[in-house]
UniProtKB/Swiss-Prot annotation:
Pathway: Nucleotide-sugar biosynthesis; GDP-alpha-D-mannose biosynthesis; GDP-alpha-D-mannose from alpha-D-mannose 1-phosphate (GTP route): step 1/1
Organism expressing this protein natively: Sus scrofa (Pig)
Protein known as: Mannose-1-phosphate guanylyltransferase catalytic subunit beta
GO terms (BP aspect): GDP-mannose biosynthetic process; protein glycosylation
Family according to the record: Belongs to the transferase hexapeptide repeat family.
Active site: 162
Gene: GMPPB
Amino acid sequence: MKALILVGGYGTRLRPLTLSIPKPLVDFCNKPILLHQVEALASAGVDHVILAVSYMSQMLEKEMKAQEQRLGIRISMSHEEEPLGTAGPLALARDLLSETAEPFFVLNSDVICDFPFQAMVQFHRHHGQEGSILVTKVEEPSKYGVVVCEADTGRIHRFVEKPQVFVSNKINAGMYILSPAVLQRIQLQPTSIEKEIFPVMAKEGQLYAMELQGFWMDIGQPKDFLTGMCLFLQSLRQKQPEQLCSGPGIVGNVLVDPSARIGKNCSIGPNVSLGPGVVVEDGVCIRRCTVLRDARIRSHSWLESCIVCWRCRVGQWVRMENVTVLGEDVIVNDELYLNGASVLPHKSIGESVPEPGIIM
């Protein structure tokens, strides 16, 4: 079985992280976002993953080729010369996707969840039509485009953009199974599958919705990245608690790479991910943060709701909070306060940032 993952975007919402590497390779809970998806696909029996690439495609190709042998699957690149939206890439990869008559997966690369791929295959085969969409329930449907479908069968009737009166609380979760017949509906041009292809399929009775059980998050921007981390760590607590850290100073759900080092009298957690080579010195407090490879947090600093990127250096007695994001190789000098700062890569911060803003 095949899968196509849409990884061609610039990742602008997740800057400054994506100024250094493409978004699919950003570590989420100590593993590239894309690898969470590819490993789940391989476990579900997918043997050929096609990546619809454009931005920093060489870096993506190098990393994924290294994973091919480990996972025992084929990984191909489909290169976009111009942005093709969310449907155009399917037309571009038509020859690969139609090598067999089997249905195939299509995934947005921003999504993290429990990935119920085997259940999706069974659901798609059961209804026997052209397309299946994974949907998830949300608390405030007026913020989203919602999916209106039959409760018992899942057949989709229509899509409603940001409804002001309640019609549904189910939204598109960004994962689909499509039969090869869908490829005949798509031209090789910039096209939205959500706005141009799916509504037509729904009118013809060819589109069904399967409801996702468990957590789901679009982690395409920093605040949602951190929320997604919290949900993922809670899922680990329930399913693979042995992967989480425990011991003195560890509070709640904390994921620590074996090569990371934590000093004395620290308070780490809840909801913290520390990557490879990270050093946390004595007396540091970290809550609801992700700290990426080879970063160093010096003694007695306090971090809450932050993303600290590769090789950053945070000084002593620093306080950072409110979705502060440090790009790659940023230095924060001692005794500073950063409130909601977004700092571009390779900067040295010498004064406090009391109000949220971008530090160029």
